[in-house]
């Protein structure tokens, strides 16, 4: 079973698209050599570690809003 579950993640981040996008970007950083922010991740894969970081609140999401005016 996936930890954390998508339902648990959506309690803090309501958009599935945002969860997937942020987790993919953070997983790439982990894969490229950056250390995971979770002390003892349950997952050994970068995507799982990125999802654990999102769930724990260790990763900050910065939203860029385009100005259409």
Curated annotation (Swiss-Prot):
For this protein, the record's Pfam families field holds: RNA_pol_Rpb6 (PF01192)
Q: Which InterPro entries match?
A: DNA-dir_RNA_pol_omega, Pol_omega/Rpo6/RPB6, RPB6/omega-like_sf
Per the record, the domain of life is Bacteria
Q: Could you say which EC number(s) this protein's record lists?
A: 2.7.7.6
| Alphabetical keyword list | DNA-directed RNA polymerase, Nucleotidyltransferase, Transcription, Transferase
Question: Which is a GO BP term held by this UniProt record?
Answer: DNA-templated transcription
Gene3D superfamilies documented for this protein: 3.90.940.10
GO cellular component, as recorded: DNA-directed RNA polymerase complex
Q: What class of enzyme is it?
A: transferase
* Coiled-coil stretches noted in the UniProt entry, renumbered to this chain: none
- Return one GO MF term: DNA binding
Q: Which reaction does it catalyse?
A: RNA(n) + a ribonucleoside 5'-triphosphate = RNA(n+1) + diphosphate
The keyword Transferase is assigned to this record: yes
- Assembly mode: The RNAP catalytic core consists of 2 alpha, 1 beta, 1 beta' and 1 omega subunit. When a sigma factor is associated with the core the holoenzyme is formed, which can initiate transcription.
**Function according to Swiss-Prot or TrEMBL:** Promotes RNA polymerase assembly. Latches the N- and C-terminal regions of the beta' subunit thereby facilitating its interaction with the beta and alpha subunits.
Q: Which family does it belong to?
A: Belongs to the RNA polymerase subunit omega family.
Q: What is this protein called?
A: DNA-directed RNA polymerase subunit omega
Give the organism the record lists: Exiguobacterium sp. (strain ATCC BAA-1283 / AT1b)
């Amino acid at each position: 079973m996936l930890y954390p579950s998508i339902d648990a993640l959506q309690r803090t981040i309501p958009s599935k698209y945002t969860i997937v996008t942020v987790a993919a970007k953070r997983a790439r950083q982990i894969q490229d050599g950056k250390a995971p922010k979770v002390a003892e991740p349950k997952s050994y894969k970068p995507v799982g570690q990125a999802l654990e970081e999102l769930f724990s609140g260790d990763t900050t999401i910065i939203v860029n809003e385009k100005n259409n005016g």
